[in-house]
Amino acid sequence: MMSQTKLEISMKANSKSKISRRSLLKSGVAATTAAAAGTLGAPMIWAQSNIVLRQSGTGVSAFNEIAAKAKEDLGITMEMTALDSDSVAQKVATQPKSFDIADIEYWMCKKVWPIGNMQAMDTSKIKNYDKIVGIFKDGKLTPTSTIAQGTAPHTVSFVDGANGKNFSSEETGWMTMIPTIYNADTLGIRPDLINRPINTWAELLNPEFKGKASILDISSIGIMDMAMVCEAMGEIQYGDKGNMTREEIDKTIGIFTEAKKAGQFRAFWKTFDESVNLMASGEVVIQSMWSPAITAVKAQGKPCIYQPLKEGYRAWAAGFALPKTTKGKQADVVYEFINWYLSGWVGAYLN
């Protein structure tokens, strides 16, 4: 589980590929069953109001099927824009009028919240709030769980009031974002081309794979993969991978810079499709990877494994956030959409 392993909360960007990103996704609500939906009462229907919700996010959950179901159940027309992680953060920070709801990643909160374009979300309006798992409230999945390193979601989940600017360490009734999905990532491998067991992050820099390794080129995520590798190699013991010292940063970057100079990496990838193409072609046999990309490689008839590693996983989480420009009836529609999103159908679909 997320909070019981050595994890860094990060996130990923996906392209507009039609390949399903559902594999291994988990809903941010502990119980999102069809039965739960029945206890919420019928959702409001907005069809006669010609309501359009502009959703901007990374594409992890930007499915046409979800938009169609929202139209069927709520009468809302969803316009979904999928971007890479850095572009999403930039858009949220600089173009709040260009969207009504943001599907963003928890690591982004420290970047975008201080700018002041987002509004806190009232948890009393979230019908399934009591079912949101503890990872997003106090950092623990169970009472005995160990809180993860990195930007653990609960550290940026709450602010100190409706107009709060500071993150709160405890529940306040006002969330920066309402959690929707989370997962944990590891290395992807081509077992047919490696022909031996892989059980540690350290293998990414094994000279055996010189010219056939890859790592993702998204700085906020890539640095975490790099840290997992360096610690697995015994080169660095981090105090907190999500809050590295300058010395830790320099040493981490130094190790990977030397590996790059030595020709360890075939390429660096930034998008979902790039990672799929590198692995499916056989140009790369071991790399940072996302579970849906594994599925995409397999769909091309190539063996590909999402390899469990003894050091644990790098986790990520996402949710819906509200810009200050979304007000009145439009804000009411956003809350209605989120309640519908957490009521069962979407959770079942994404799983």
Predicted regions, residues:
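Early extracytoplasmic/lumenal segment of secretory-pathway proteins
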Residues: 48-115, 276
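Short amphipathic alpha-helical coupling segments at ligand-binding clamshell hinges
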Residues: 200, 328-341, 346-350
